Amino acid sequence: MLCLGAMSERSERYLVTSALPYANGPLHVGHMVGAYLPADIFVRYLRMRGEDVVYVCGTDEHGVPITLTAEREGKSPREVVDYWYAHMKETFARFSISFDNFSRTSTPLHAQNTQLFYRKLKEGGYISEAESKQMYSPTEGRFLPDRYVEGTCPVCGYKEARGDQCDNCGSWYEAYELIEPHSKITGGPVEVRTTTHLYLDLPKFAGRLKDWISSQRHWREPVKNFIISMIEGGLERRPITRDISWGVPVPEPGFEDKRFYVWFDAPIGYVSSTQEWAERTGEPDRWREYWQDPGTRLIHFIGKDNTVFHTTMWPAMLMGVAEDGEEPYILPYDVPANEFMNLEVPVEGERRAVQMSTSRNLAVWLHEALDRFPADPLRFYLASTLPETGDVVFSWREFQSRVNSDLIGNLGNYINRVLSFTERYFGGTLERPSRLPAAAQEAFEDFRALEESYGRKMLDERPREAFAELLALGRRANRFFDAAAPWKTRKEDPERARADLYACCALLGSIAYHASPYVPEAMERLQGFFEGPVERITDLKPPGAYRSAGARPLFSRVEDEAVARAEEQLSRALLGR
C-alpha cells in the first residue's frame, strides 16, 4: 500500500486560492502554468507534510466577457456560464487539480457576500458617487461597456480599435476618444453621455497599503518596489459599478439598472468558495479560521496581469470591511504571480514563438491535450517550464523530449528497473539488512541534502525550482543503482545485492514522495505493486521489508506521430486555416 509519510512538525494554517477563470471559453495551457498547476503542486506538498490547508477556486461568471460571448452566440449569460462552469470543472478534474471547493460567482451566497462587502465599505466611508462619460447606443437604448465599442484609433489610425486599447499600436485611451466610434454588436453609431457610478476611495488606503507591502520581507523585491512606487505616485478612485444587466445587483436606490464591476465581486468569490467548503464539511463557521485568524497564511496564485489588483485593491477591500467591530480579515501572505506562456509553432520549415490568441484558436486547449495524452506527462512538462521568473514558450517537441528523457528515462526507468529486478531475482521481497553498505549511506546523505533543498523551494512557492531537485534525486538514485550493479552481485554476493536493492527501494520511496505533487496519478498507481513507506529519507524509519508484485511501467513514450498531429493543429491556426 502507498503511504505518504507526513512530517511531524506543523507550522501554519494555509488558505490557497487560484485566480477565478472567466466562464466564457475553454482552459488552455497558459492558464495552467499561470495560476492552477503551481498552486496545485504547492497544495499537494503541504498536504503531504500534514499541514492544515484549504484550496479554493471557482468560475468568474459576471462582466463584459460573459455578455459578449452570450450575444455573439445568441444565448443568455446564464446558459453560457452554466455550460463553461461544467466544462471547466471537468477539465480541472481530468488534469488532477485538487480543489477542496470549486465554486462560481453566480450563486445567491456570493451575491449576499458581495453586497455585504459593499455595505461595510460604505459604512466605513470608503464609497463615493460620481459622474463619468460613457458611450451610449441610441439604437440599443443602453450604455455600452468599452469592449462593446469599436472605432478608429486616435493615435495610429487603426480602423478596428477596441474601446479601451488599440491592438495595433498598443495605445490606451477612453472610448469617447475613438474616431467614428460604433457599436460592436449592431454596427450603429454611439454617442457620449453622462452616467453615475459608485467608486472605491482607494487613496484613503494608501498609507496602510504602503506600510503593509513594505513589511512583506518574503516578497520578490521587484514586485514590492513596483507596487510601492505606484502607491507613492498616487492611487485613484476605482469604479465598482457598471451599466450592465448581468452581475450582482447594487443594493442602492437609483442603481437598480446597474451591477457591480466584475473586478469588485470576483475576489469576494474566494470568501464565498471557502464558506461553501465549510458548509459542506458540516462546520459552517469554520471558514472564519481561514479568513480571520492571523495564524493563517493566505496565498493567491495568479498571472502577472492580476498583480496590481491583488496587492492594492483587494487588500484595501479586506482592510475596509473589518472596521465595524467584527474580526478583521487577514491580508495576503504572498501573491505568487507567474509570467506568460507563448507557443512554438512550426510554419514553412521554421519554428516561431508566437503569443496565444484565443480568438484565432491559436492555443493549446487543455481538454484537447488531455484527449491526446494522460494528465501526468502534461503536468510534468508544464511543471518543468513554469514561468516563475519570465515568459516561457510551450513546445510540443520539448514536451516529447522532457517526457521521454526525464520522466521516463530518469524517474520512470529507475522505478521500473528496481522493482522488476526485485521481483525477478528476489521473489518481490527485500528484508531489512543488518547494515547498509557505505555507498548506500552516501546516497542517503545526498538525498537528505536534496530533500532539504526541495522542501525549502516548495515552501517558497517555487515548484519549478523544486522540480529540478526531483530530477536530481532520480539521477542520484540511478547512479547508485548502476554502481551497485545488482545484475553482478546477485550471483557473486547475493546478500550485498539484497542490501543494495533494499536501499534502492528506500530511495524509490523518496522519489515517489517528491514526485507525487507533480504526477499524482502515476504515484497512486504505484500502490498497486509497491509496498513500503513513501517518504523522505530524512524521515525514514526502515521497514522490516519492501515488497513488489506485478510491477509495470508507469509511463508511455510520446511518439513522433502524436507530436506531429498536435503541431499541425497549431500551424493551421496560425495560418488561419
Curated annotation (Swiss-Prot):
GO CC, one annotated term: cytosol
Superkingdom, natural source: Bacteria
Subcellular location: Cytoplasm
Residues reported to bind ATP: T358
HAMAP family: Met_tRNA_synth_type1
Similarity annotation: Belongs to the class-I aminoacyl-tRNA synthetase family. MetG type 1 subfamily.
UniProt-recorded name of the protein: Methionine--tRNA ligase
Organism: Rubrobacter xylanophilus (strain DSM 9941 / JCM 11954 / NBRC 16129 / PRD-1)
Gene expressing this chain: metG
